[in-house]
């Protein structure tokens, strides 16, 4: 009698897995961003260091600290991938200077939490300073740059990242403006190529009830995981709001979004600034974790490219994909360290295979939700509908120009603005 219920449970579970697999990227992302999936995932992630420590205490294995540090690095890159996914995957902006905000946050915290300029702010004040500084730089770059489109925006943001690196390297001595030295002879703001050392960690309890003493490496792993959970929560809340829908509309078709009255500049700037502040806070946590702020890799273009690969690997606009991309691009290099000559070959082969077999990313690109038809059923945009649309009469250049002019007139009308 007991075999039949067990068999039915197995059949139901296999049916659920089959439905999950056939639901496609949209179904995968919806399923993986539900609370009943995310809450156990983050609770399990918080428990991983404790499990590693338990295994180390009860065996001859001694890798708990090493693997916790690897997972902390993975969580840090997952935070950066989620932040970049906001501006690239949601709003469709190609920000090649993204990692510069990570470096700005790192240096901003180091300056107010070290002896470099003899300032030691409390944690809440340091978070406020880092947020304001990164926001100021984001507005300084974003206000003029976001009026550009496509490749021009990418070029401007790339130039910003390169300029910030040079500025950090040169501020180990008093700057010279218009032939005059600004500041005393001994002025050293950023430490140049050496960076800023002896950055104080966060003033947090070193012991917790029921857990006892908490090592430094474990505490910062938990901080990264907690900040990642916070970013995921707010991103999911934003996605279903007017702001989130405006971002996706701008990404998919900016001209159509403008024609519908969306203030595209405002929403593009909001995505750009929010992503920058998130990256700055991640840089702050990193500086407190390693007690230093360095110009490399904090301002390296290679780091931006690596985070871009994580986002594209997981799927544009996919939050679980950003986490999966960070794991897939961070953990394997550590596993292949003993095969140093083959490490990058294996990683390259894996990336090429993903590009060939999953060009939209491991979890696919997230698009606008299915639309509702007059009959009340959900209609998906499929290849068949694209074929039907291709059979319609072609639109001439004159008609396109008329539409653009009409769209500009609508946007200028304040009654049509959101």
Describe the predicted segments one by one.
Residues 2-418:
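Transmembrane alpha-helices and adjacent helix-loop boundaries
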């Amino acid at each position: 009698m007991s075999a039949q219920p067990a068999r039915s449970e197995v059949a139901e579970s296999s049916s659920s897995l089959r439905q999950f697999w056939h639901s496609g990227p949209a179904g995968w992302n919806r399923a993986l961003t539900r609370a009943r999936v995310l809450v156990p995932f983050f609770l399990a992630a918080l428990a991983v260091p404790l499990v590693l420590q338990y295994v180390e205490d009860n065996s001859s294995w001694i890798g708990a600290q090493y693997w916790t540090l690897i997972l902390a690095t993975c969580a840090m890159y997952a935070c950066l991938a989620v932040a970049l996914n906001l501006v690239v995957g949601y709003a469709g902006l190609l920000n090649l200077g993204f990692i510069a905000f990570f470096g700005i946050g790192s240096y901003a915290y180091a300056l107010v939490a070290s002896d470099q300029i003899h300032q030691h702010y409390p944690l809440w004040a340091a978070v406020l300073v880092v947020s304001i500084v990164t926001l100021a730089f984001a507005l300084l770059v974003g206000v003029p740059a976001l009026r550009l489109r496509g490749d021009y925006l990418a070029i401007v943001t790339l130039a910003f990242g390169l300029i910030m690196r040079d500025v950090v390297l040169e501020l180990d001595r008093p700057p010279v403006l218009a032939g005059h030295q600004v500041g005393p002879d001994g002025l050293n703001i950023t430490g140049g190529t050496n960076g800023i050392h002896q950055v104080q960690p966060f003033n947090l309890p070193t012991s917790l009830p029921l857990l006892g003493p908490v090592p430094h490496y474990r505490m910062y792993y938990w901080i990264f995981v907690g900040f990642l959970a916070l970013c995921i929560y707010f991103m999911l809340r934003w996605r279903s709001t007017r702001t989130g829908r405006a971002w996706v509309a701008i990404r998919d078709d900016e001209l159509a979004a403008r024609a519908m009255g969306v203030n595209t500049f405002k929403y593009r700037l909001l995505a750009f600034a929010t992503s920058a502040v998130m990256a700055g806070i991640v840089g702050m946590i990193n500086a407190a974790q390693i007690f230093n702020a360095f110009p490399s890799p904090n301002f390296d273009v290679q780091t931006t490219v690596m985070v871009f690969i994580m986002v594209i690997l997981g799927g544009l606009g996919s939050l679980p994909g950003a986490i999966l991309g960070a794991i897939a691009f961070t953990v394997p290099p550590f596993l292949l360290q003993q095969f140093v000559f083959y490490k990058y070959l294996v990683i390259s082969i894996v990336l090429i295979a993903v590009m060939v077999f999953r060009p939209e990313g491991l979890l696919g690109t997230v698009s606008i939700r299915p639309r509702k038809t007059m009959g009340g059923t959900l209609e998906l945009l499929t290849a068949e509908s694209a074929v039907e649309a291709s059979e319609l009469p072609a639109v001439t250049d004159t008609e396109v120009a008329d539409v653009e002019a009409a769209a500009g007139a609508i946007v200028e009308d304040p009654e049509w603005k959101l």
